[in-house]
Amino acid sequence: MDWSTQRVVILGGARQGTALARYLVAQGAQVTLSDLKAAHQLDLQLLAGLPVRFVLGEHPLSLLDECDLLCLSGGVPTDLPIVQEARRRGIPLSNDAGLFLDACPAPVIGITGSAGKTTTTTLVGEMLKADNPGRAVWVGGNIGNPLISDLDRIQPGDRVVMELSSFQLELMNRSPHIACITNITPNHLDRHGTLEAYIAAKRRILDFQSPDDWRVLSADNSVTAALGGEGASTLWFSTRGRPAEDGAWVDEAGNLRVRLSRASSPELQAAEGAVICH
């Protein structure tokens, strides 16, 4: 994308919003950052000296009059009047995670779930580093620093492990090459409103995969057990016995077992092993 022609409004001045602002300014975009807090309540030092316009203390609808893309930080609700008005006007919505996936040159393992996603993300990263000490492995997303801050340093031969929350996923229109859902149980219903909406947000990590991609899913969770099938290839994991299809499980003696009917990558093996061990 030629960002030099784009006017981007970012809602939320926390770490995701400021990281995204720095990235977009570097790409040549015209950036406005808006936050409901006052300047003294925010840490905006990372944006000092950059050509960013600030609108603080409110999110006026007039921000949309000169807006080609509206980006939300992770904690910004999607039911705000300005977000609803952007949808009415047909202004695209995105966030730092979505723009990162759009531009990342390296394969990405994306991990989400109601529980265990941070541990699994960290473990997958460590396993990949141990497998090939000479290869750069980037771990981030909903943990650590926003990965978009590192985008200019990531090379095609690197590997990326990305934790993704439901807040990030609900605005994304791209799936990672390997997508893992540890489990789905009722959570964040104050944000999503219904369990069905929460499940739909989590499912978006899978929705844009191609037949060349992979999904790693729990056979023990009633929600994720229904998410295999069409699209990407599926690997299952279970602590209750051997899955009917390819995957990993813990046998009666407590040993980790893996069955794969086709060749897989170290990245896929790491994701499969980590989710069952977390």
Predicted regions, residues:
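Short, solvent-exposed coil/turn linker segments
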Residues: 1-2, 38, 42, 95, ...
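Short, flexible coil/turn micro-motifs enriched in small/turn-prone residues
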Residues: 7, 12, 52, 108-111, ...
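Adenine nucleotide phosphate-binding catalytic loops in nucleotide-utilizing enzymes
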Residues: 6, 11-14, 74, 192-199, ...
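Phosphate-binding loop of NTP-binding sites
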Residues: 25, 62-65, 74-233
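Cofactor-binding loop segments of dinucleotide-utilizing enzymes, especially the Rossmann-like FAD-
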Residues: 13, 35-36, 114, 142, ...
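Beta-strand->loop->alpha-helix junctions that form or flank phosphate-binding loops
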Residues: 32-36, 55-58, 94-98, 138-140, ...
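Short linear Ser/Thr-Pro motifs
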Residues: 16, 34, 73, 114, ...
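N-terminal leader/targeting and accessory segments in enzymes
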Residues: 1-95, 99
